[in-house]
């Protein structure tokens, strides 16, 4: 089996590899840099659209059996800005599924930078005086000190993939 992920982000690629290992799917994984078709910091529904676009763009750019798109986004709910991700999986036969990560609230110090036009990763780097946090621990890692960005993505990758390995009508 050949799986293409529509991102070269290290945390996303490693999450897909770990998820495939957990569910026992023996697959070669390739990461491809594809367009999401949404803003660099998606909000709410844009996040879903970006994940779907990445999955299909990865599928179309390769000869993969499954294309996977992971898009991180932010949504405003109950006076809080919440960060979350959408994972979308699709194949060329028309099978598709999606899932969401857990959502977590962002402190105002980060939200302020995001509302000024920065991505969450940039805001994280500024607040925590680091570089390329989105390739590693991510905002979730710096905020919780125990959950990494890779770990945040593993469960929704598994949930998005279940129709591809657990054939239930």
Swiss-Prot record:
InterPro entries cross-referenced by the UniProt entry: ITPase-like_fam, Non_canon_purine_NTPase, NTPase/PRRC1, YjjX_NTPase
Alphabetized UniProt keyword annotations: Hydrolase, Magnesium, Manganese, Metal-binding, Nucleotide metabolism, Nucleotide-binding
GO BP term, example: thiamine metabolic process
Reaction catalyzed: XTP + H2O = XDP + phosphate + H(+); ITP + H2O = IDP + phosphate + H(+)
Residues that, per the record, bind Mg(2+): 35
Residues noted as binding substrate in the record, renumbered to the chain: 7-12
Hydrolase keyword on record: yes
Cited Pfam families: NTPase_I-T (PF01931)
GO molecular function: ITPase activity; metal ion binding; nucleotide binding; ribonucleoside triphosphate phosphatase activity
Keyword Manganese recorded: yes
Names of the cofactor(s): Mg(2+); Mn(2+)
Top-level taxon of the source organism: Archaea
Cofactor note: Binds 1 divalent metal cation per subunit; can use either Mg(2+) or Mn(2+).
Broadest EC class assigned to this enzyme: hydrolase
EC number: 3.6.1.73
Subunit structure as annotated in this protein's UniProt entry: Homodimer.
Family: Belongs to the YjjX NTPase family.
Function description: Phosphatase that hydrolyzes non-canonical purine nucleotides such as XTP and ITP to their respective diphosphate derivatives. Probably excludes non-canonical purines from DNA/RNA precursor pool, thus preventing their incorporation into DNA/RNA and avoiding chromosomal lesions.
NCBIfam families: inosine/xanthosine triphosphatase (TIGR00258)
Protein name as it appears in the record: Probable inosine/xanthosine triphosphatase
Organism: Sulfurisphaera tokodaii (strain DSM 16993 / JCM 10545 / NBRC 100140 / 7) (Sulfolobus tokodaii)
